[in-house]
From Swiss-Prot:
Pfam families: Chitin_bind_4. GO terms for cellular component: chitin-based extracellular matrix. InterPro entries: CHIT_BIND_RR_consensus, Cuticle_Struct_Prot, Insect_cuticle. Residues 18-82 form the Chitin-binding type R&R domain. This is Endocuticle structural glycoprotein SgAbd-5.
């Protein structure tokens, strides 16, 4: 199935409004993403949001690739797996 014809087949989305959230989705063409975030050191001068997650897609070579990541005060830190 081509990307333009893909539909969302699974979706979750939660946000507590206080700095924590998570979401995930999967599409009919095999793309998937999940992410969760949380406020760290709330109320301090070191307050930051830390995000962890992953996404998966099919490359032009037909292989599935998954990128897992952390994003925080140290920047975006991805790791690719195939």
């Amino acid at each position: 199935q081509s990307g333009k014809d893909a539909t969302i087949v699974e979706l979750t989305n939660d946000n507590d409004g206080l700095g924590q959230y998570n979401f995930a989705y999967r599409t009919s063409d095999g793309i998937a993403r999940q992410e969760q975030g949380a406020l760290k050191n709330a109320g301090s001068e070191n307050e930051a949001i830390e995000v962890q997650g992953s996404y998966t897609y099919k490359g032009v070579d037909g292989k599935d690739y998954t990128v897992t990541f952390v994003a925080n005060e140290n920047g975006y830190q991805p790791r690719v797996q195939s």
